[in-house]
UniProtKB/Swiss-Prot annotation:
Keywords: Disulfide bond, Protease inhibitor, Serine protease inhibitor. The lineage of its organism: Eukaryota, Viridiplantae, Streptophyta, Embryophyta, Tracheophyta. Residues 1-20 are annotated as: Disordered. This is Bowman-Birk type proteinase inhibitor PVI-3(2). Signal peptide: none annotated. Residues 8-18 have a biased composition (Low complexity).
Length: 85
């Protein structure tokens, strides 16, 4: 049914797992560059995302539509050493 994501408490102190990161980031060659992350995340976007669009599927696939002048660090580096694929 209608879940609503209220993130009033997680804005100031975001947990380490939800810190912003991006594996697929593309920037324009303009100055300053305009960078967008095309990562698909399940059920939510990263903590710094202002414009998050999710599909209505289960689980929801979410993409952040923000345009920044930088890319966040890659998410893959946060996994443990046993996760090498």
């Amino acid at each position: 049914s209608g879940h609503r994501h209220e993130s009033x408490b997680s804005t100031b102190x975001a947990s380490x797992s939800s810190k912003p990161c991006c594996b697929h980031c593309a920037c324009t060659k303009s100055i300053p560059p305009q960078c967008r992350c095309s990562b698909l995340r399940l059920n939510s976007c990263h903590s710094e995302c202002k414009g998050c669009i999710c599909t209505f599927s289960i689980p929801a696939q979410c993409i952040c539509t923000d345009t920044n002048n930088f890319c966040y660090e890659p998410c893959k580096s946060s996994h443990g050493p046993b996760b090498n694929n």
